[in-house]
């Protein structure tokens, strides 16, 4: 059943996903080869209607699922009971803080940080993402500020040696680009393919970002 669900997700077939989980809600508990539950697979898909229905059908949420689904009170309850969970990777390799960031759960991210979550902790899967990478991917400026205040390494790399600045430049988000540079992001770091944040902005024609980075590079 999990393989059928995965096929529907790959093909972005929301109606078939919803029909599948309505008929077989137990698939939400099943785990794929990467360690993701059916619920998490749907969450990662970005298919909002299917995700909303999955949350309605799910009866019990583990710690990481509670974060992804924005269940603040349940996350808090887990932390009060098991403090060490704040830095425990999910079965598919992501940190609690990175999951909170990726799903724009800023209040949950704040709760995790207040309870000892390490902002620099990377995923154990091939993505190697940390919370800042996820926050930049979602263009969540406030969370980026919060992570920086909590000492995150702005130059940490994920897969292909991508930094948060590379990601922000790719998105053309000048506000986050400035925030990162003002807090120590190195402009000339290269990805595996040789691109810098400046060259990315130039290629994608994000003129304001390019002009800002080019000026900073020449100082």
Model-identified regions with their sequence ranges:
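Ankyrin repeat structural motif
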Residues: 14-21, 47-54, 71-79, 105-113, ...
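Ankyrin-repeat inter-repeat connecting loop/turn
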Residues: 27-28, 85-86, 119-121, 154, ...
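Start-of-repeat signature of ankyrin repeats
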Residues: 35, 59, 93, 127-128, ...
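Alpha-helical adaptor scaffolds
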Residues: 122-125, 129-149, 155
């Amino acid at each position: 059943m999990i393989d059928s669900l995965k096929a529907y997700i790959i093909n972005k077939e929301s109606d078939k996903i919803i029909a599948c989980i309505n008929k077989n809600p137990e698939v939400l508990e099943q785990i794929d080869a990467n360690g993701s539950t059916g619920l998490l697979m749907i969450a990662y898909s970005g298919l909002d209607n299917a995700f909303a229905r999955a949350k309605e059908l799910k009866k019990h949420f583990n710690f990481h699922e509670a974060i992804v689904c924005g269940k603040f009170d349940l996350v808090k309850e887990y932390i009060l009971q098991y403090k060490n969970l704040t830095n425990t990777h999910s079965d598919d390799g992501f940190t609690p803080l990175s999951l909170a960031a990726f799903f724009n759960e800023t209040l949950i991210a704040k709760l995790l940080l207040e309870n000892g979550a390490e902002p620099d902790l990377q995923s154990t899967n091939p993505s190697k993402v940390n919370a800042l990478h996820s926050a930049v991917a979602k263009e969540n400026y406030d969370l980026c500020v919060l992570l920086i205040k909590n000492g995150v390494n702005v130059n940490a790399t994920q897969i292909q040696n991508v930094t948060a600045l590379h990601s922000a430049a790719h998105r053309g988000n000048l506000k986050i680009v400035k925030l990162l540079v003002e807090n120590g992001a190195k402009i000339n770091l290269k990805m595996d393919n040789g691109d810098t944040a400046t060259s990315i902005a130039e290629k994608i024609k994000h003129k304001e970002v390019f002009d800002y980075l080019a000026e900073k590079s020449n100082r």
